[in-house]
Design a protein with these regions (language model features):
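Surface-exposed cleft-lining segments at the edges of enzyme active sites
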Residues: 4-8, 65, 70-75
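Hydrophobic, well-ordered secondary-structure scaffolds
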Residues: 65-66, 87-92, 101
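A conserved beta-strand-loop-helix scaffold within acyl/acetyltransferase catalytic domains
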Residues: 11-36, 41-64, 69
Length: 178
């Protein structure tokens, strides 16, 4: 399989293909692909948080990151992204997990979509809400560096309260109470 040339929001297509292979090799790694023939035209990835990021600090086996969602330009507008993300959450597959995604405006295709940063954020929030993900507050400096950046989270119905509390401690480093 090859990557569509327009799948370059996070890295060059060949490098992104290598990253997908690496994620597929992770025990917790999950990838949903959209393809036409042998060409990948969209993908969604799930994996544990990078060990260099704050989200890994809690050492939580039930915390997984929706790391990326991308659809090639010419395939946008057909609901492919929404269908991929809904498939990932179908049939209670992630009810035992806290799933989070960090939305940073610098990864968004503002130029290609001709959307403002706020309209793009609304579009991303709508997409994430289609699987029950909602905005969560955090004091993470990268997220707080721009008001359009955000943390979206879905807490599965089978996640224990102790994990939710641990996630809250990771979300807020600067608070003693929340």
């Amino acid at each position: 399989m090859t990557m569509h040339a327009a799948l370059d929001a996070f890295r060059r297509p060949r490098e992104q293909h290598e990253a997908l292979i690496e994620i597929a090799g992770l025990e917790e790694g999950r990838i949903i692909l959209a393809r036409e023939g042998d060409k990948i035209v969209g993908y969604v990835t799930f994996h544990y948080p990078d060990e260099l990021e704050r989200w890994s600090e809690g050492g939580m086996p039930d915390l997984i990151e929706l790391g990326a969602i991308e659809v090639a330009d010419e395939y946008r507008g057909y609901g492919i992204g929404k269908r991929m993300i809904q498939l990932a959450f179908a049939e209670g597959q992630l009810e035992n997990m806290i799933v989070f995604t960090t939305e940073y405006y610098w990864h968004w295709d503002l130029e290609g979509t001709k959307l403002t940063v706020w309209d793009y954020r609304k579009m991303m929030e709508k997409l994430m809400k289609s699987v029950g993900m909602v905005w969560f507050a955090t004091d993470d400096p990268e997220i707080c560096s721009h008001p359009a950046n955000c943390l979206m989270v879905r807490i599965g119905q089978e996640v224990p309260l102790s994990s939710v509390e641990q996630f809250d401690r990771v979300r807020f480093r600067q608070r003693f109470m929340y």
